[in-house]
Amino acid sequence: MIVGIGIDIVELERIQSLLERNRKFLDRILTPREREQFDQLAPARQVEFLAGRFAAKEAYAKALGTGIGRHVSFQDIEIVSDEYGKPSIAARRDGEVIHLSISHSRDYAIAQVIIERFGPAKPSDACHG
């Protein structure tokens, strides 16, 4: 059963501007492990990476139904990649599968998250978007 859907799109130029004005933006958005990955990338790829992670975390928070804020922060959400580069969200709750897709164009990064729960439905289960 799908219990949450979230999508987010961000302009690469906006992320580039935030990064140029305040490098602390990185520490707010990326976990230490994500920051290690970021630091190993070529400068041209860093903005795409950061924008994709930003969009993925926003999409996940929307799928949870909370958004980024009081209940979940950027640091609570970690995006990891498998050996083939496929991203996934490290946070998992029992009985849930989180589907994540991140894509980039020349100007934008977009991410979509779908949260599925297996087992008996709970009264609190509802789709958010």
From Swiss-Prot:
Keywords, in A-Z order: Cytoplasm, Fatty acid biosynthesis, Fatty acid metabolism, Lipid biosynthesis, Lipid metabolism, Magnesium, Metal-binding, Transferase
Cited InterPro entries: 4-PPantetheinyl_Trfase_dom (IPR008278), 4-PPantetheinyl_Trfase_dom_sf (IPR037143), ACPS (IPR002582), P-Pant_transferase_sf (IPR050559), Ppantetheine-prot_Trfase_dom (IPR004568)
One GO cellular component term: cytosol
Coiled coil: none
Molecular function in Gene Ontology: holo-[acyl-carrier-protein] synthase activity; magnesium ion binding
EC number from the UniProt entry: 2.7.8.7
The protein's name: Holo-[acyl-carrier-protein] synthase
Species, as recorded: Geobacillus thermodenitrificans (strain NG80-2)
Gene coding for it: acpS
